């Protein structure tokens, strides 16, 4: 009902408060990082990184605008996956921007700075990460 005020009293419950802070942070990222909103209809600004793990319900993609790249990784299942990976054509570093499994959002992962470096395996640069159940992680990707 748009005629009445939001149910702000729900924020006294940890799960609601966590979700409120998660959406607030996500909106801030969206408004301040052009790779989230520029060229959204340009097919060259989007690249699937992992779609072959659909039986696991794991998906990863890159959004690139000019020299800026964001990597999104999602686990839509109730399983914890360790060392989920994707191959990249050059060495990169991922800097975590947000993780829906952070404790402050109601999850189980402690908030700490996370940087993931790709590893060369004689064929490609491999990026590995853990994906807890029902989790989305967003990273800024830098070339190294």
Task: List the model feature ranges, each with a label.
Residues 1-144:
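Carbohydrate-interacting/catalytic domains
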């Amino acid at each position: 009902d748009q005629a009445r005020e939001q149910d702000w009293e729900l924020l006294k419950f940890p799960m609601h408060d966590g979700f409120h802070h998660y959406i607030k942070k996500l909106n801030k990222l969206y408004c301040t990082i052009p790779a989230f909103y520029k060229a959204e209809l340009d097919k060259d600004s989007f690249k699937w990184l992992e779609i072959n793990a659909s039986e696991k319900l794991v998906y990863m993609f890159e959004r690139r605008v000019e020299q800026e790249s964001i990597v999104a990784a999602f686990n839509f299942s109730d399983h914890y996956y360790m060392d989920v990976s994707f191959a990249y054509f050059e060495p990169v570093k991922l800097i975590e921007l947000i993780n829906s499994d952070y404790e402050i959002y109601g999850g189980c992962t402690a908030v700490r700075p996370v940087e993931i470096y790709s590893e060369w395996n004689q064929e490609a640069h491999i990026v590995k990460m853990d994906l807890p159940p029902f989790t989305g992680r967003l990273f800024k990707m830098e070339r190294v």
